[in-house]
From Swiss-Prot:
Lineage: Bacteria, Pseudomonadati, Pseudomonadota, Gammaproteobacteria, Enterobacterales
Classification via Pfam families: Mur_ligase_C (PF02875), Mur_ligase_M (PF08245), MurD-like_N (PF21799)
Alphabetized GO MF terms: ATP binding; UDP-N-acetylmuramoylalanine-D-glutamate ligase activity
GO BP terms, alphabetized: cell division; cell wall organization; peptidoglycan biosynthetic process; regulation of cell shape
Keywords, in A-Z order: ATP-binding, Cell cycle, Cell division, Cell shape, Cell wall biogenesis/degradation, Cytoplasm, Ligase, Nucleotide-binding, Peptidoglycan synthesis
EC class (word): ligase
Gene: murD
Cystine connections: none
Binding site for ATP: 112-118
Protein name per the record: UDP-N-acetylmuramoylalanine--D-glutamate ligase
Location (main, coarse): cytoplasm
Amino acid sequence: MADYQDKNVVIIGLGLTGLSCVDFFLARGVTPRVMDTRVTPPGLDKLPQEVERHVGGLNDEWLLAADLIVASPGIALAHPSLSAAASAGVEIVGDIELFCREAQAPIVAITGSNGKSTVTTLVGEMAKAAGVNVGVGGNIGLPALMLLDADRELYVLELSSFQLETTSSLQAAAATVLNVTEDHMDRYPFGLQQYRAAKLRVYEKAKVCVVNADDALTMPVRGADERCVSFGVNMGDYHLNRQQGETWLRVKGEKVLNVKEMKLSGQHNYTNALAALALADAVGLPRASSLKALTTFTGLAHRFQLALEHNGVRWINDSKATNVGSTEAALNGLHVDGTLHLLLGGDGKSADFSPLARYLTGDRIRLYCFGRDGAQLAALRPEIAQQTETMEEAMRLLAPRVQPGDMVLLSPACASLDQFKNFEQRGDVFTRLAKELG
């Protein structure tokens, strides 16, 4: 447990995570100062009166006078104000670092470009099925500091690359990097390897590293070692096995579950299940209750979620596909009886869209591209693409064309912030329009 007495603490960024940091310090007799670049950040009205605040920008004077800065993952460490503070010797951490210094129970730490939330939630469900007092959160649900509880027996945290950059005390009982594909390139000017390096920090001091046998970028820098357990489609300690038209989850050659018993569907979800099982096994959760959790888990909203099935047409909401890798995961191994009507678009965050091209072949696919980077996406295969300003226009365009056996899939490969509040709002609008048009 760290001692923060008499420390001059500055918290950057409000919202739920910022407020959890304020509460953390107040409970330890330290009154922090708070700043936020937004003029009216969420949570401002919930800030106790004694806490000094500075909004609408950063206060360099406060930062340089601080002993400790707790930075929101939303602000880049490369920001000139943070760089100056770091150069002056000020310690900069995030809420996950504060959490790791306090947590008394084992931690399962999950990162990756795609699938993090599903795997985090699944491991949490496996722990609950075993009767374990588990805290689940971090980058999803509740901020980590709100999970701290002396009675907890296990923590399961989803961690972003930004959170890992400011974390050095994590000693995970089991850690995984599920996959590494281009995302947030606007925050990583040195490209994919810089982003990967942030993700791989999760393995430092971990007891067990769960790696993806199909993605070399998920391996620790020095290569796989005796701490590593692997999962993959055809390879790995945990893998898929197809026999007589049926698919099984297998562990080291032993069949453990037929996927038809699972409510999740799609190859990417089967590998998510393998990763979750590997993590659960690594921290000693009973295999039987973990498998039971796999048969009852229905998946998370906006992640390849069936919004409507009507007149033989399936409308799928995969709004959480905010990067290219996530859309690749949705398209890889996808079976559609008729034509796939694929909705792509939004803010591509400077990503390279070309890896999608190999999934856009044949004559049973149509593209509807919208938003800031719609033109770039339409250029992947212009002869089957139509470009509109908004997703709603695209959906009204495609609705009269769908036939029984077709699928309408929103898997945009882009962030939503150019036209929506967040990916959830985009998914909700898609679902509402699907019910109206379908």
